[in-house]
Structure formats: C-alpha cells, structure tokens
A protein has these predicted regions:
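Loop/turn-to-beta-strand initiation segments
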Residues: 3-5, 75-79, 155-156
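Glycine-rich, flexible N-terminal cofactor/catalytic loop recognition
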Residues: 1-59
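Conserved helicase motor
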Residues: 56-62, 136-139
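A contiguous loop/helix-start segment that scaffolds small-molecule binding in enzyme catalytic cores
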Residues: 2, 156, 160-277
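Alpha-helix capping/helix-boundary segments
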Residues: 38-40, 85-86, 115, 165
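Glycine/small-residue-rich loop that forms an oxyanion/phosphate-binding "nest" at active or ligand-binding sites
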Residues: 68-114
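Class I SAM-dependent methyltransferase SAM-binding "motif I" and its flanking Rossmann-like core
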Residues: 95-153
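Short active-site oxyanion
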Residues: 26-32, 105-108, 156-157
Length: 277
C-alpha cells in the first residue's frame, strides 16, 4: 500500500493555534519534512511529540523529491510543515506536491493558520475578493514593475514583506498607489505584540520612520483594490494620450487630456512620460 503525504499547517505565532488534527497527524507519521528543523523542534517539543525530522527547503527540495517519493511508494506516511502557516503558500513544497500528484499519490491537507487570511480578516478592507501576491521582488525596479500591475487590480491585494525591505517597499507603494491609498500593515499576527498599523500608506510610512525598533519579523500588507471607475478613467487617459503624444508636445497632450477627463494634471503628466519612453 502506498503512503500518504500530509500538508500540515502550523501556527504563525501563537503555538496554541495548532489544530487537534494537526497534532494527531504529527503524532502518527513516519517522518516529518520541515522547512527548518530547528524551528520544527521547538514546535514539536511544545507539543510533546518525538518525531523523525528531515529538512526540505528551497535549497534542497528538488534533490529530496526522488527520496521522498520512494518512501511514499514504499508505504511511508510523511508530513510536510513550514516554519509557520500553511506549506506552499510563499513557502517550499510545490515541486514535491506536483511530483506526488504525478505519481498518483494521495496528498492530504491538514488546514490551519495562514498569515494572509488572518491579516485580511482583521484589516477592515473588503474580503469578498482578493489577490494574494506573496513576497514582493527584492530589487526596486522589479518591485515597481510588479506594483504597477497590482495597482490596476480591483480586488483587495495581499503582499508579504521582510523586515529588511519593508520601508523601501512602502515607499515604492506610495510612488505607485499614492500616499493616501487605503492600506493596513499587520505585524506579529497572533503574537503578544500583534499590531495593525495605518489607514493609508502614508500613515504606515510615518509609523516605520518613528518606530524603527518595531520593525521586526515578517509583515503582511493589505491594500485596497482599485475602483472600477478609476480603472475605466485610467484606460481612457491612456487612449487619449496614445493618440495625442505622437502629434503634440507632452504639455499640450496633458492639458487636453485633463480637460477631457477631469483627471489630475500631475498624474496625467506622470503617465504621459511613462508612455513617451
């Protein structure tokens, strides 16, 4: 009989958020694949579970897959956990699951915590439709390219960011979305010093500038989606500018476009320069 691969969600901060089913699964498994065995040991010690731990992370996943599949095909039951939250969600494991499915092996979800969903649920920003991006790119140019695509979305946007790039990313968001754009920064969700910051991007920027000692760990940023009317207006601006720029100066094109749409001249000028390049 073939073994089963369990995708086990773990707490994102408060260890007591572990589910009973997750505990039962980890207690009755042949071995556990952990993103970081040191982090996993702390959780297992808290739960009083002794288990055979092996690492599976972004650096060794492809190398480990054949070995793991062999164990599964031999009848071993295996659990995959990440450092926190649901495995595969901005964490390793996708390639393993993909290959397990190809081998017709059973992959079983053991649901639980997710920082993205926890943050969204308390953000006060619409939850009916949302777009999860994950971690933004490390370099400014690539990050701006992504943000320029995200700003067009009507859905609520969820992104993760690390402590080292948080301030830079917020500044980039202000550049693309505008400082008054509705947004909430969620830090240390489910932990003792859990905090939700800001009503807009400018408030978040000011908080980070005034509280450098609080910039620790990983963060979730929830951004309000763009209204349909704004998207339609942007498309109209692009259409007008694309017709005018080949035949008149930027200044004249901006003036005509502003009169036609009633839109802010500065924003139209910025867009005109982007189209002109």
């Amino acid at each position: 009989m073939q073994g089963e691969l369990f995708i086990v969600s773990t707490p994102i901060g408060n260890l007591d958020d572990i589910t009973l089913r997750a505990i039962q699964t980890l207690q009755n498994i042949d071995f556990i694949l952990a993103e970081d065995t040191r982090v996993a040991k702390k959780l297992l010690k808290h739960l009083g579970i002794k288990a055979n731990l092996q690492s599976l992370n972004e650096h060794n996943e492809l190398k480990k897959i054949p070995i793991v599949l062999k164990h599964l095909l031999e009848g071993k039951n295996i659990a995959l956990i990440s450092d926190a939250g649901t495995p595969l969600i901005s964490d390793p494991g996708f390639q393993l699951v993909k290959q397990a499915k190809k081998e017709a092996l059973r992959v079983i979800p053991i649901p639980g915590c997710s920082a993205a969903i926890a943050a969204l649920s308390v953000s006060g920003i619409p939850t009916d439709r949302f777009y999860f991006y994950g971690f933004l790119p490390k370099t400014k140019n690539k990050r701006l390219d992504v943000l320029k695509k995200l700003v067009k979305k009507e859905e609520t946007i969820i992104v993760y960011e690390s402590v080292h790039r948080l301030s830079s990313s917020i500044n980039d968001m202000i550049e693309v979305f505008g400082k008054k754009h509705i947004a909430v920064l969620c830090k240390e969700i489910t932990k003792l010093h859990e905090e939700l910051i800001g009503i807009n991007l400018e408030e978040i920027r000011v908080f980070l500038m005034e509280n450098p000692s609080k910039i620790k760990g990983e963060f979730t940023v929830i951004l309000n989606g763009k209204k349909s009317s704004e998207i339609n207006n942007t498309e109209k601006i692009d259409s007008i500018l694309k017709e005018l720029l080949p035949i008149v100066s930027v200044k004249v094109a901006v003036k005509i476009c502003s009169i036609s749409t009633g839109y802010n001249k500065n924003k139209i000028y910025k867009r005109a320069l982007e189209l002109k390049i």
